[in-house]
Amino acid sequence: MLDRRSFLRYGRPPVATSEASLAPYAPSDAAPWDAARARHLLRRTGIGARRDDVDALLAMTPEDAVDRIVRTARNRPPLPEPLWIGERKPRARAPQEERQAWIDKNDGWLAEMYQGTYDRLLGDDVHGRFRRLGEAFRARMTAFWANHFVADLRTHKIAVWLFEYRQTLRAHALGNVRDAVHDIGLTASMLDYLDGNTNRAGAPNENYARELLELFTMGQVGPDGTDNYTQADIAELARALTGWTTSKHGEAAVEFNADRFDSGPKTVLGQTGDYGYDDVVPLLFQERAWEIAHFVGRKLCREFVRDEPDPAFVDVVARRLLDEDFELLPVVLAVLKSAHFFDAAHVGALIRSPVELMLGTHFGFGRDVYDGDLQTLRNKTRRMGQDVFDPPDVRGWELGRAWINTGTIEDRVRYGRELVHHAPPSFIPDTLARPVAADPRALTAALCEEHLAWTLTDDEVDDLANDHLRNGVSDYYWDPASDDAAVRLHSLLIALLSLPAYQLR
């Protein structure tokens, strides 16, 4: 049985052999450009690593592979506007039937948004390998920023607002951090979630100002251990953010009301002026550039490298972010091309989120996510601690080891096993038809490499082959064409998905 304590012991030594720098990865005998590293790149930029994608990457240099995925992601188009984007929410005094009809339609629109989010992470409905891989990475980066600029399902209950919020995150997924901070604060979801609607001259609401400093830009404490701001800064910043409200009819548009704006002088981070919304975001990046770069840089390192990144590497990434004037594209390219990223100590060093685990299993077994799967998928990821549009609070999900506890670990294993039972009908026969299937150990090793982010020892592979394919006897008695071969292979796949290593990426 998989328990939390054994799971948390199951990991690589935390010490990398590469230096904490952005020096590019150069394949060598000690660190070859092989299937394990190609899968590592695919799992960190997408939701999984299929054999044909691995082969395609290995036909390229690692530098070219990163370029194709990341630059394609950057060039992916905006989300197409749904047909319902202009529909207005009925007024509160509208007949009950009209209001209920809108609620029913809105629920359907929200379901469309869930389906679209899963499809994009899987790269579905995108033709061409690198367009598909690029779309999956764009979706991953959108999800990354959704866990940074957090708004919850209470505000997303209006589908138009959710679409605008996700479209804004997607637009800035690999863009400029400063621009992202500016634009996300003027979405209806964020104004509603952090009480911008009630922030007005003479009666400021400090919620958004506080989270803008603490969670969206610099954090409470800088890398040198000193406070980044004071309560007075929060109060003055809140005054500068007054005047903006959401539409009262469920539209995505936000409005500036000069009568609600505090036009007096404010002092923020030691600077004084008649600041408004458009003034204070550049001011924060001017006065706390290093602190913001470090705060965001550490999050990028946690996303791509490991949950507790090397502080020296965080400093290097933060410095590069500063040098690039907070443009993400060159920074992400540098991180993913670095020897530090490809260091063996970082392969399989991150724990999959519930959404990554469930969608990754669908992806690994070639199973699409259909409309009928949506509620089941959402219910299961919620039980494991993640509802894709509904983070627990404004801090978002904690990630890493926080995903694993006594209440979630059995669900994570059980749901993975269930997906094996519902793999496409062709998966088992196609696997048994592969040339490698003639050798039970070789087949076991191949499946371990394909489905696990962490390479097992030779003894572990032997044990799996012996327990499930050989059935405790010699290779002579293994025949992939036999009547019981499918049953044995199914048993092996269940065993693989029950391993702690399957929870990693």
Located regions from the model:
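Extended, compositionally biased low-complexity polar/Lys-Gly-rich tracts
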Residues: L133-H148, D233-L237, T242-T245, V296, ...
